[in-house]
Amino acid sequence: MDTLFRLVSLHHHHHHQHAASPSPPDQPHKSYPSSRGSTSSPSSHHTHNHTYYHHSHSHYNNNSNTNYYYQGGGGGGGGYYYAEEQQPAAYLEECGNGHQFYMDEDFSSSSSSRQFHSGTGAPSSAPVPPPPSATTSSAGGHGLFEAADFSFPQVDISLDFGGSPAVPSSSGAGAGAGAAPSSSGRWAAQLLMECARAVAGRDSQRVQQLMWMLNELASPYGDVDQKLASYFLQGLFARLTTSGPRTLRTLATASDRNASFDSTRRTALKFQELSPWTPFGHVAANGAILESFLEAAAAGAAAASSSSSSSSTPPTRLHILDLSNTFCTQWPTLLEALATRSSDDTPHLSITTVVPTAAPSAAAQRVMREIGQRLEKFARLMGVPFSFRAVHHAGDLADLDLAALDLREGGATAALAVNCVNALRGVARGRDAFVASLRRLEPRVVTVVEEEADLAAPEADASSEADTDAAFVKVFGEGLRFFSAYMDSLEESFPKTSNERLSLERAVGRAIVDLVSCPASQSAERRETAASWARRMRSAGFSPAAFSEDVADDVRSLLRRYKEGWSMRDAGGATDDAAGAAAAGAFLAWKEQPVVWASAWKP
């Protein structure tokens, strides 16, 4: 008997024991095969004594006041259920203390993991707690939410979460999507999509029942399914309570408080060491920029030698406008390449990095100041004349005054490159106009690296209510696909216990809350597909510049350094369904699924 069927059956069994619970309709229960079996996650066994948070726990088993027991196996890795006391204030804020998010060391509920014997997957005889109801409290606080959290105020989708979870209904939104996932599939995607359809269909009973199931199964310290369920459940809860922007601000503030140069550096370097997710775009973009700059430097040197015989001709000045979110980890390799591949005088390189933020951040300024100092020191070691400037821009990137940046340095700059790494998706409005403004800079090359996902949703007032609901389901499903691939790659690339992995997963949690719960006009998660970006670039007057064979070889050599599963694919076959425009550049694929797109463009 599988996990979810036992959850539903248990509710039916306890229905007669709770007078406040509504009578379920007379219909059969749906079963959901468990995908975990005996898979064990060791996350509940290690000591969380790391940079970001410090935990203090008291252990107990067979507590007389609860129905939770110690089990040695199961999807959550077994172990004792932990109390939730003495958490630091910063930890509680980042993890959503308003609803006791992430308060437990192991959120795997008794019904989702500790009810399975190790290696067999058979249910244990330990009792399972009753479903939350208006009169039932969560004694142990084992899930993401307390029972009272499932009583929502009346909002625009007319939800009323008051009683205990209802038996699955065969009618209403999401009923047709209730096909049981295969044993080899992942249960989180099935349940989360059903829940999203129920939210869009305003099926309050279905939403309530599915959210309770997800609350029982979710854990930010479990396997990929449990983590996805945890983060998306948090986003759905924030959406239903119209608290998305406030929740996101709380999470972002706590994360910013814990930010430092050392922690940022460790996370970025470890991510690049274990995953090609960011190095793929860096290598491809650097290759295109370097080839373009070397051509400009050679042309400048030839012009200088023909016009003057003086030996004091200044080096060619090159400038990069860096619109990225990778903390300048891209540039040391470019500085080294300029030093080793310049035939004559090494050109002077200037980098202007734009750091977009929702609000001015002292922590971000400290980090970028330290990064600039280290880049300047490295450039001196490489013998490259170098200058660095960080521009902190609060608000939409579309409001950035590019002309005020003086990228041409009074006409001294011989060649300008614009590097956009995960930056264009930060433009909330007027994306075509912003790309056109890049064209007016007359750059020698523009490199664009974006994650491959179609998460751009229409504004709420731009379409009918039905279209908006359909768009929510579409964006939710695409976000689930994209973040599943990302989390899966982290799962296979990082060790089970890693501070850096925890930091990256926390960022995923914030991104999911943003995507699911924030209005489209306020969301920063507005990724588009490669074909869509290619259409915008062509409309602005850019033409695709194919990566040279040398650059392609460098990328393939890079991927061989990482675990199996990564590959490079030509993006030429990807098309925009709306306009039929073909993409350009190359894809980084994880298990044959495109996840990152890199391209180069010339005016």
Swiss-Prot record:
Residues 31-44, 108-125 have a biased composition (Low complexity). Residues 517-602 are annotated as: SAW. Residues 370-406 are annotated as: Leucine repeat II (LRII). Residues 268-354 are annotated as: VHIID. Pfam families: GRAS. A motif (VHIID) lies at residues 318-322. Residues 179-602 form the GRAS domain. It is found in: Nucleus. It comes from the Eukaryota. Residues 186-249 are annotated as: Leucine repeat I (LRI). The keyword Phosphoprotein does not apply. Its main location: nucleus. Residues 45-58 have a biased composition (Basic residues). Keywords: Developmental protein, Nucleus, Transcription, Transcription regulation. Residues 416-514 are annotated as: PFYRE. Residues 11-58, 106-140 are annotated as: Disordered. One of its GO terms (cellular component) is nucleus. InterPro entries: TF_GRAS. Belongs to the GRAS family. PANTHER family: OSJNBA0084A10.13 PROTEIN-RELATED. Does not interact with SCR1. Putative transcription factor involved in asymmetric cell division. This is Protein SHORT-ROOT 2. The lineage of its organism: Eukaryota, Viridiplantae, Streptophyta, Embryophyta, Tracheophyta.
